[in-house]
Amino acid sequence: MKFSPLVQELIDSLKCLPGVGAKSAQRMAFQLLERNRRGGSKLANTLAKAMTDIGHCQQCRNFTEEALCEICQSPKRQLSTTLCIVETPGDVIAIEQTGEFFGKYFVLMGHLSPIDGIGPDDLGLDILAKQFATGQFSEVILATNPTVEGEATAHFIAELAQQHQVNISRIAHGVPVGGELEYVDGNTLSHALSGRKSYQI
């Protein structure tokens, strides 16, 4: 069965969302058209405004409507000499929710991937190098994902930081809290063993 051109365009547009296939997009489109036109209009308006108004923080590259994001504008954060480097804005939220980190961030918006044509400049590493050169950071925490690409990106940034005499640390990877060893995969267990630390009593 063929849908009207506009209905088909709506379905195709919804398929751009991650994890949304043809069937899911069709259900969403029908839900908006049949039962929630007001919600659909609000979604369309908010989406249009977000696409126009949301950009990147000039300092950390996180999403913001201002020149600097809320974290970079914080007087307490401005005094910090610790920089945490993450791949996505979602990683910033995850770390902030722990309540354990009070430094600054740098959001790469991805990771190095030569196959996909993503190089250092695409991740803003030229901006990062300039920040290292100012001497404002005493430590950089590499919080990229424990994937092949994430590790390659961390290694590249570590070499960059080393050129500017910045101390480098990497977030620990290992056994999840509440997990049982027999169910942990070999790579994770290997990371946990190599990253072990002394036990404090």
From Swiss-Prot:
Entry keyword Metal-binding: yes
UniProtKB keywords: DNA damage, DNA recombination, DNA repair, Metal-binding, Zinc, Zinc-finger
Domain Toprim: from-to ranges: 81-176
A GO molecular-function descriptor: DNA binding
SUPFAM superfamilies reported for this sequence: Recombination protein RecR
InterPro entries: DNA_Rcmb_RecR, Rcmb_RecR, Rcmb_RecR_Znf, TOPRIM_dom, TOPRIM_RecR
Zn finger spans (C4-type): 57-72
UniProt keyword DNA repair, yes or no: yes
GO biological process, one term: DNA repair
Database matches in Pfam families: RecR_C, RecR_HhH, RecR_ZnF, Toprim_4
Function: May play a role in DNA repair. It seems to be involved in an RecBC-independent recombinational process of DNA repair. It may act with RecF and RecO.
NCBIfam families the UniProt entry points to: recR
PANTHER family: RECOMBINATION PROTEIN RECR
HAMAP family attached to this UniProt entry: RecR
Family membership noted in the UniProt record: Belongs to the RecR family.
Name of this chain's protein: Recombination protein RecR
Organism of this sequence: Colwellia psychrerythraea (strain 34H / ATCC BAA-681) (Vibrio psychroerythus)
